Amino acid sequence: MIATLTFWRSRQTRNKVVFEEERTRGKAPVIGTMYVSKDWLDAAGNPEEITVTVATGDDA
C-alpha cells in the first residue's frame, strides 16, 4: 500500500517545525502531526508545505 500525504506548516518549537497533515473529510489521518528539523527545512528553502510518501510491504 502506498499513501502520498500533504502536510502544512503549523508552528515551531526550539529546534523543529511542526507540520499538520492535510485532512480528508470523513477519513482519519494517516500520520497527523510531524516534527521536522529546522536545519533540514532551512536547506530545503523553508517550505510551507511538504509531501511525504509512505509505502508498506512489497511497495516499499
Q: PLM features: residue spans?
A:
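Short active-site loop/helix that positions an aromatic residue
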Residues: 45
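Short beta-strand-centered segments at strand-helix junctions
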Residues: 29-41
